[in-house]
Amino acid sequence: MKYTAEEILEVHRMLNEEDLDIRSVTLSVNTLFALSDDERKVIEKLKTLSSMLEKFSESVKEVSEKYGIRVVTKRVAVSPIQFFLEALNERAGIEIAKTLDELGEKHEIDYVSGYSAFTDRGMTRGAERVLRTFSEALESTKRLTGMINAGSTKLGLNFDSIKLFVDEIFKMSPYSSARATIIANVPPDSPFVPSAHHGLGMPEAVINVAVSGPGVIEGAIKRAQPKTLQELHEVIKRASFKITRLGELVGRKVAEAMGIPFGAVDLSLAPSPKVGDSVAGIIEAMGIEKVGGHGSVTALAILMDAVKKGGAMATSSVGGLSSAFIPISEDAIMVERAINGSIDFFTLLAMSSVCNSGIDMVGVSKRQGKDKVIGLIADVLSMAVTLNKILGVRVIPIDAEPGAVVDLGGLLGKVVVMRLKDVNVSKFSSYTGFIPSTVKRLEMG
């Protein structure tokens, strides 16, 4: 394929002026070869991953330097730890967590993801052990991330696991709870943490890629000054095509260097705290004075559809969440809007209906209690189950009044403690069991 001089200059501008980068190159690797009822054997087998992780780290660095494309993070996704804890005790889970964390540190891997369990309809021994060690595992590590898939359109929503999850994150520091999520309909090939894990049906090892690029789309809209909604859609679609093509190039080259298959490109637009790298900035460039104002959901829906259509044209290997992320703390403009009140939890719930982010990187006040957080999570995951969407919740419990701001630094940004509704929901949150799958399940046959 030949490139015009204009296209080359455009890519140069994207990389150097509009913060286009690869958010993550993720090695997803099967670790079930290490299964055993002997903790010592599991640890020793997991340590044999060292040579693969070394090669992965070197390959990403080489590809990044060769093409002049910044890769923000290197990540590794492993098989869910639930499977290991079916035959091992809770203490073994902590030791496995520490071993994976040490491997990540040794090879300069930013995150190792997979301290995870599936509890859609109920909990096996392994799943419950993961949940009950969740806080200790993440507090004992720096790079480990974890996910609880608490629901699916096929099986329903497990209320008990939501309550256990909330108990665990209330024990965590903000830095640890930022590495924990609860989700419904989780995909098996996500390159994004904390949801990343080596899912069922995947090959032995595979490379998945997450792109970034909100600044590219915002810049394209501002330059084009579209007059109609069709023109606006087209501008976003074309920019998305170019972003995705770059992501696939990097992913395929890393996979080629490692001698393993390339998996998928996650089309999600991931913001960062840097100025000019904001999903909220795109919505405001589309004509909403402050994101959260009426019309914001429509603007986000247009953005999502155009990004997916442009991305699908650029690659036949689409995977992960493939949506727009609206993590409040990781988006500088979202932080401002949350502080001034134009963004609240109901705004985020409405936006979740048209994207796959859910409620992400938002602070909640421990002083408002667990019951309200349980209800909030149930609201988001119920939408996922009912609409057959991927949605998750990553909230940061903080011992402060609503309105407080805690700076976690780096990509995690500033966490705004947003006010939960002052309505008593303790009776509802005291229910046990699971919510049966909806009528949507019947449409699947």
Question: What are the language-model segments listed below?
Answer:
Residues M1-G445:
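Anaerobic metallocofactor- and corrinoid-dependent redox/one-carbon enzyme cores
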